[in-house]
Structures are given as structure tokens and as C-alpha cells.
């Protein structure tokens, strides 16, 4: 088994079994819901954004497959302490990575632990699982009231 595939499996299993930030932060002032109608994954992302646009706290709740849960867990770790603009940039990089674009491959080093999702593009149905929490995060960051969907 390749090192990246082994890291992928280890990381996904760890974050699925023990998701980080699986909660609603007490002071959350933004939230959004996401739903994948094809597989039934559901997620709610909660943010506490300060007056300067920095995410002080982030959490999520919901139910979904291992990839969706692990993606949400790793996402919360990646965006805490970041500005809204930085989060939108990370969103774009992550989306390019899991969609298999050349730009995403080039940026994988900038994504840290999130780069374990680089092989997801080989499984198109799983791309939606990995990106659902991210689309939901983007809706929360932007303050959109719609349910984020992968379709």
C-alpha cells in the first residue's frame, strides 16, 4: 500500500471515529446546513466570527459517511483562527484538490493534512461527500440562508 493511501485510510478512520469539534460552540453567530440528496449526508456548520472577520470557534454536527465526517473534522481544524478571506481561499484550494484539477495538485502542499483527500477525485461520488462540509462552511461564512447542496 502506498504511503499516501495508508495515510488517507488512517486519517479518515481516525477523524470519522473521533471527529474533532463535533459540537455547537456556545457563542456561534453564524451557521449553515448542508445536505447531499444522493447519499443522505447532512451537516450543520457553526462559526463564531469576531468583529475583524476571524473565526474564533468552529464546530459541526450531523450524520454522514466516513469521508464526509472526516472532511468536516479536518476542515474545522484547518479554518479555526483564519479570516473569512483565508477560509474562502482554502475552500477553493481544497475544492480544486478533490476535483482533481492541476491547480489543486500544485496547491496540495499548502493544505497540510487536508492533502490526504487528493485521491478522492478518482471516485466522483466521493467528491461530493468530501466537499459537502466545505460548501456548508462557505454558506456559513457568507451568511447565506440557503441549504448548501452538492447538486
Stretches with model-predicted labels:
Residues 69-70, 89:
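Alpha-helical macromolecular-interaction surfaces
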Residues 62-69:
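Short, thiol/selenol-centered motifs that function as redox-active sites or metal-ligating centers
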Residues 39, 65, 129:
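Functionally engaged cysteine thiol sites
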Residues 1-26, 82-151:
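C-terminal binding/interaction regions
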Residues 71-83:
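Alpha-helical support elements that line or immediately flank enzyme active sites
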Residues 18, 22-62:
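Structured beta-strand/loop patches that form or line metal/cofactor-binding pockets in enzymes
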